[in-house]
Each structure stands twice: as C-alpha cells, then as structure tokens.
C-alpha cells in the first residue's frame, strides 16, 4: 500500500467488525439491492470509535464496483478513539510512523481508499441525522475528551462536520460547520 512502512511478513487486521468482516452477508445484501433496483440506501452505524463516511460498492474494486450504499459511521462519545488504540498498539513497531499524528493516519487511509470521503479517527462524539425526501444529512459532533479528573470540559464541542447525500446520488458533500 503506498505510504505504508515495510514490515517483515507482518499481517495486520485493524478491524473485523465491519463490512469486510462479513463478506458473504455483504455480498448477499449488495446483490439483493442491485438485482431489485433498490437505490437511495444509507447506513448509519457506530462502534468503530471514529467518524467516517464513504460509499460501499457492490464489488470492492473501484474500477468495476458500483456504489450501492452511503455508509456513515459515528464515533462513540465515551470510548477512546480508534487512533488512540492504534497508537498504543503500534508503538515501537514499523507501523508507528503511520500513527505519528491523527492527520497522518486519516490522510493515509483516505489516500488508499478512494471511496472514503471523510475520516476522523481521533474523535469522540455523537451524530444527528436529518432526513427529507430530497436529502439525507448527518452531522458529526466532535467533543473534547474528558478532563484528567473525569469531568467534562466547560465548552465540550470541538467541531462539527455535516455530510449530505442527495436523493438518487451517492456523492457526499462534506461541510465543516
């Protein structure tokens, strides 16, 4: 993978509790959508400890696969970030440079996944969705981590990002608000 450090015969599984952890089920769902001409499908999930948004293709190869679902993934508000888990796990390994900063990890993942249109792996927060006949929008609300004494910061909101997809489209508009 371009930009990834060389590791001696190492294999890394970052997350099996996602689409790629269930290839048969993913294939069955995407085939059903394609065969029945079902469009305007979105998924909004969590449990990755990060904010992400991208398209899921009926075939994972971007050259041949057709986008079938727009997938919105929300960070948890009270759990550690995906970035923090990787930083701790990769400390002292050839992969440590990949998590030198949160921006390094996010830019690497986006550069190597053309279907990922938003990534923030160093995040805690929550999401809200607005659904109309013409548009599906999700606002990711990133909050500051708890203070060292376990209390919430006085001004907890760190940032907001709105991601929107219009009816009959899989193109996601990203707006930092």
Residue ranges and their predicted role:
Residues 1-177:
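Long, structured stretches of catalytic cores involved in phosphate-ester chemistry, encompassing
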């Amino acid at each position: 993978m371009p930009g990834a450090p060389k590791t001696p015969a190492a294999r890394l599984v970052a997350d099996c509790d996602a689409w790629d952890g269930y290839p048969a089920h993913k294939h069955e769902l995407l085939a059903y959508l394609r065969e029945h001409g079902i469009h305007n499908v979105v998924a909004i999930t969590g449990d990755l400890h990060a904010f992400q948004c991208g398209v899921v293709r009926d075939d994972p190869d971007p050259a041949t696969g057709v986008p079938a679902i727009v997938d919105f993934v929300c960070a948890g508000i009270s759990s550690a970030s995906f970035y923090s888990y990787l930083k701790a796990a990769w400390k002292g390994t050839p992969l440590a440079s990949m998590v030198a900063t949160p921006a390094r990890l996010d830019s690497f993942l986006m550069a190597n996944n053309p279907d990922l249109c938003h990534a923030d792996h160093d995040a805690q927060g929550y999401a809200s969705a607005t659904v109309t006949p013409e548009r599906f929008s999700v606002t990711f609300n990133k909050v500051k981590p708890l203070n060292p004494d376990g209390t919430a910061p006085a001004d907890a909101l760190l940032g907001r990002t709105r991601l929107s997809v219009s009816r009959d489209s899989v193109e996601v508009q990203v707006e930092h608000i």
